[in-house]
């Protein structure tokens, strides 16, 4: 899940619906792997993608709009880190810490308590952000093979 700011803070995906975030944090029946704001914030992607000679790409078109609005070095990759881990797993890209995620107030601030018996994991940078940007952007630029 792309949610939270670690070890504590306030992040949009939590505070945009604090009651729902609290319910998920307290009642979700399985382990949640949190990719916090700090993980994707320094991973800039999209610059090479928008320069590709490909037409009718909704991903390229969306990134082109971001660049037009002032992201000349690329777009932060918060959600993309969560997708990468969901598809490929966190190894070898990230270390993890086990603990408990909590929504601590009605404004949607969160906290993290490290605990070897906690039900959640949070990602911790292992591969430098610049290398992660190359890896993620290469996946974004992949073109389907024609049959």
Indicate residue ranges for each PLM-predicted region.
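Class I SAM-dependent methyltransferase SAM-binding "motif I" and its flanking Rossmann-like core
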Residues: 1-9
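Conformational coupling and interaction surfaces
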Residues: 15-19, 23-26, 31-147
